[in-house]
From Swiss-Prot:
Gene3D superfamilies: 6.10.140.2100, 6.10.140.2110. Its EC number is 1.7.-.-, 1.11.1.-. Residues 2-148 form the Globin domain. This is Myoglobin. The lineage of its organism: Eukaryota, Metazoa, Chordata, Craniata, Vertebrata. PANTHER family: MYOGLOBIN.
Length: 154
């Protein structure tokens, strides 16, 4: 399940492109998530009222939250699998406070892949996509493991 050094390098190379403009990447990831899986919007009291893509694009709060999400994920990815210290508090809040099911983590992972494909096709070929999928799967597996320890069946 672990990634090779080369795979981590592919992940971090494309992530460098994300970090060049985290707010717009984060906004696009959340918009894709909410459009593709409208049920996920119900977990976000701040955004429930946003019904159209135009409303979502105009929301500074959505853009800020997208940046927060991708900043946290970037911190985890940079640990190259040695991310227990970063995962624990994230799993704690997502299991006990926000009650975010693991399935929703799969949905946002799909959205991240789609955004990277559309924004960075030249830097996100098949090898990079495969590596990012593995990295996001590792993240979800470790979140799910922490959820289980916390007694959250999400």
């Amino acid at each position: 399940m672990g990634l090779s050094d080369g795979e981590w390098q592919l992940v971090l190379n494309v992530w460098g492109k994300v970090e060049a403009d985290i707010p717009s990447h984060g906004q696009e990831v959340l918009i894709r998530l909410f459009k593709g899986h409208p049920e996920t919007l119900e977990k976000f009291d701040k955004f429930k009222h946003l019904k159209s893509e135009d409303e979502m694009k105009a929301s500074e709060d959505l853009k800020k939250h997208g940046a927060t999400v991708l900043t946290a994920l970037g911190g985890i990815l940079k640990k190259k699998g040695h991310h227990e210290a970063e995962i624990k508090p994230l799993a704690q809040s997502h299991a006990t406070k926000h009650k975010i099911p693991v399935k929703y983590l799969e949905f946002i992972s799909e959205s991240i892949i789609q955004v990277l494909q559309s924004k960075h096709p030249g830097d996100f070929g098949a090898d990079a996509q495969g590596a990012m999928n593995k990295a996001l799967e590792l993240f979800r597996k470790d979140m799910a493991s922490n959820y289980k320890e916390l007694g959250f069946q999400g």
